[in-house]
Amino acid sequence: MSDYIVVKCGGSMLDQLNDLFFDCIKKLQQKYKVVIVHGGGPEIDAQLKDCNINAEKRDGLRVTPKEVMDVVQMVLCGSTNKKLVMNLQKHNLRAVGCSGCDGNLLQVQPVSEEIGYVGEVRYVETALLKGLINMNYIPVIAPVGINDNEIYNINADTAAAGIAAALSAKELIFITDVDGVLHEGKLVKKTDEFEIVNFIENGVITGGMIPKVQAALASLKMGVQKVSIVNGTKDFTEVTGECIGTTVTRGVSIA
């Protein structure tokens, strides 16, 4: 069991996770070393609304001035992270929650001054993750990072991709509420980056699936071997550890 798997669970999925999801994590853990990265967008938006703070996005990134960063940190590192950790432990999965600023885990480069405290992963302190895994814990990572002793918000997809690339992970799994990419009503089980681009250009992939496959393509460019898009409300893992969904690679052949 030497290969790493990174599982990215979006904030909109956290309240939909059922027993099947946790059973799938158990199956993955029998074959691989598992790391989970989570989002928290809906809860952040709700908290910002309660605080009468404007929520704004540019090019898919949350504009994060200081007052927004305080809320992002409170939600991601606090309630959202701990809720997922407790849920894993309730299903007899040993988990430790931490954020990207703990132990300098995720060191970031600021994206631009115009969008505030938003960073891109430039370095991952993998020794911390490996240490937790070697003690049979699943690291559960809140996507915030650190630069010059300041905390930055990180897009959860790119945080997961950065961690997967740093660990030379065998696979990055995006947990969604759909079965994967559909073509003429049928699930596309295996594809590559060139076919995905063609699907987007020809309108096969539309709506909410576009950002998911774009995140998959970005992950491949960062060095991840393969990316799977799966339905987290269903059994998405074979007993072999293979995913049931759409698997995207840089080439048509899947190792």
From Swiss-Prot:
Record localization: Cytoplasm
This protein's pathway: Amino-acid biosynthesis; L-arginine biosynthesis; N(2)-acetyl-L-ornithine from L-glutamate: step 2/4
One GO cellular component term: cytoplasm
Catalytic activity of the protein: N-acetyl-L-glutamate + ATP = N-acetyl-L-glutamyl 5-phosphate + ADP
GO molecular function: acetylglutamate kinase activity; ATP binding
UniProt cross-references to Pfam families, sorted A to Z: AA_kinase
Protein residues bound to substrate: G40, G41, R62, N153
Signal peptide: none
GO BP terms, alphabetized: arginine biosynthetic process via ornithine; L-arginine biosynthetic process
Site, as annotated: Transition state stabilizer: K8, K212
InterPro entries registered for this protein in UniProt: AceGlu_kinase-like_sf, AcgluKinase_fam, ArgB, Asp/Glu/Uridylate_kinase
Enzyme Commission code(s) on record: 2.7.2.8
Keyword list, A-Z: Amino-acid biosynthesis, Arginine biosynthesis, ATP-binding, Cytoplasm, Kinase, Nucleotide-binding, Transferase
NCBIfam families the UniProt entry points to: argB
The family this protein is said to belong to: Belongs to the acetylglutamate kinase family. ArgB subfamily.
PANTHER family documented for this protein: N-ACETYLGLUTAMATE SYNTHASE, N-ACETYLGLUTAMATE SYNTHASE, MITOCHONDRIAL
Role summary: Catalyzes the ATP-dependent phosphorylation of N-acetyl-L-glutamate.
Protein name as annotated: Acetylglutamate kinase
Taxonomic path: Bacteria, Bacillati, Bacillota, Bacilli, Bacillales
Gene that specifies this protein: argB
